[in-house]
C-alpha cells in the first residue's frame, strides 16, 4: 500500500528515517492497543538517543490515546470477528446494530447501522472482554491517576513480550505516555486551496499507478473488500471500479469526495484539540515558526 497511502519514497526515507512503516500486511488487523505499544517502543528508542520523536499522520484517535491514555480494550480476535461478519452476511448489519443496542445502548447511539467496522469492533470488545465499550471508557478516570514511574514499570514488563496481548498485563488500561507533547496542525488557509490540493493529490496517485496497486490486492484470495485496509479512502473506490460497479470517472470523483470528507472530519477534530498550534501550508516561515515553538515549550 505505497501509492494510496502516499508513503515516502526510498530516497526520502533515507534522508528522513520513518518508523512504523511496512509493519503489517493489508490482510492483518491492527488495533489502537497495538499502535500504543509500537509507538511507545519507538519513542523510547528515539529519546534514549537524545532525540525528539516527531509523530506525523492524520489518525486523530491514535494521537489522543497516546497523549491521554485509554481504557483497556482487548486485542482483535479473528474468530469473534468472523462470527460477527457471518451473522452480518446472513442477517444484515442492522441486526448487528440491534444486538449492540441491547448490550450497549450508548455505543449504539453513536455508531450508525451503516458503519460495519465500528459495529464489529464494539460487539467484538464485549464478546472478548465481557465489558461494553462504554464501561471500558468509563474506567478511563482510573487510568489517569497512574504515575510516570508506574508507566515505565508496567511497560518494561510488557516490553519483555512483544505480543500485543501483553498490554492486558497493565491493570486498568493504558495510561497516557510519559512525555510532554507539542501539537501542531499544518493546513491550507482556505477550503478552496485544500480541495485543489486533494484533487491534485488523487490525480497524482492515479498517474503513478494506483489502480494497478489495488489490482494486485483485488486478485489476492486472502484480501477482501470489507477488510479495513481496503476500506481506506481511495482503495474502496478503486476496488469498486475494478469490480465493475463504478466507471473510471465515477471512481475518481468519489475518491476525491471521500478524501474531502475525511479532511473535513480531521479539521473538526482539530478545532476542539487542546493546546494546538495552527500553522498554514503556504507560510514560507512555517518551519522556523514550528522550531521556535518547540524550543520555547515548557517540558
Please report, for each region that a protein language model flagged, where it lies by residue.
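Phosphate/pyrophosphate-binding catalytic cores of soluble transferases and nucleic-acid-acting enzymes
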Residues: 1-299
Amino acid at each position: 500500500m505505497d501509492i494510496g497511502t502516499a508513503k515516502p519514497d526510498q530516497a526520502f526515507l533515507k534522508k528522513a528515517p520513518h518508523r512504523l512503516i511496512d509493519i503489517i500486511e493489508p490482510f492483518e488487523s491492527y488495533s489502537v492497543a497495538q499502535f500504543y505499544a509500537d509507538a511507545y517502543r519507538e519513542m523510547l528508542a528515539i529519546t534514549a538517543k537524545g532525540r525528539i520523536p516527531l509523530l506525523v499522520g492524520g489518525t486523530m484517535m491514535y494521537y489522543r490515546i497516546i497523549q491521554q491514555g485509554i481504557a483497556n480494550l482487548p486485542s482483535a480476535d479473528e474468530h469473534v470477528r468472523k462470527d460477527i461478519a457471518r451473522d452480518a452476511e446472513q442477517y444484515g448489519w442492522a441486526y448487528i446494530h440491534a444486538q449492540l443496542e441491547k448490550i450497549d445502548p450508548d455505543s449504539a447511539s453513536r455508531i450508525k447501522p451503516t458503519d460495519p467496522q465500528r459495529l464489529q469492533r464494539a460487539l467484538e470488545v464485549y464478546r472478548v472482554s465481557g465489558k461494553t465499550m462504554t464501561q471500558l471508557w468509563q474506567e478511563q478516570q482510573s487510568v489517569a491517576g497512574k504515575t510516570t514511574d508506574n508507566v515505565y514499570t508496567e511497560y518494561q514488563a510488557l516490553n519483555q513480550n512483544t505480543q500485543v496481548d501483553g498490554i492486558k498485563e497493565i491493570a486498568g488500561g493504558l495510561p497516557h505516555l510519559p512525555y510532554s507533547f507539542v501539537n501542531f496542525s499544518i493546513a491550507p488557509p482556505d477550503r478552496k486551496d485544500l480541495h485543489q490540493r486533494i484533487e491534485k493529490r488523487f490525480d497524482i496517485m492515479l498517474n503513478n499507478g494506483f489502480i494497478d496497486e489495488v489490482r494486485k490486492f483485488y486478485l489476492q484470495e486472502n484480501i477482501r473488500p470489507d477488510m479495513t485496509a481496503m476500506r481506506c479512502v481511495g482503495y474502496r473506490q478503486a476496488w469498486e471500479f475494478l469490480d465493475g460497479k463504478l466507471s473510471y470517472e465515477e471512481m475518481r470523483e468519489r475518491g476525491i469526495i471521500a478524501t474531502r470528507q475525511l479532511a473535513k472530519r480531521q479539521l473538526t477534530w482539530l478545532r476542539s484539540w487542546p493546546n494546538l498550534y495552527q500553522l498554514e501550508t503556504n507560510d514560507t516561515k512555517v518551519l522556523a515558526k514550528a522550531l521556535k515553538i518547540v524550543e520555547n515549550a515548557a517540558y
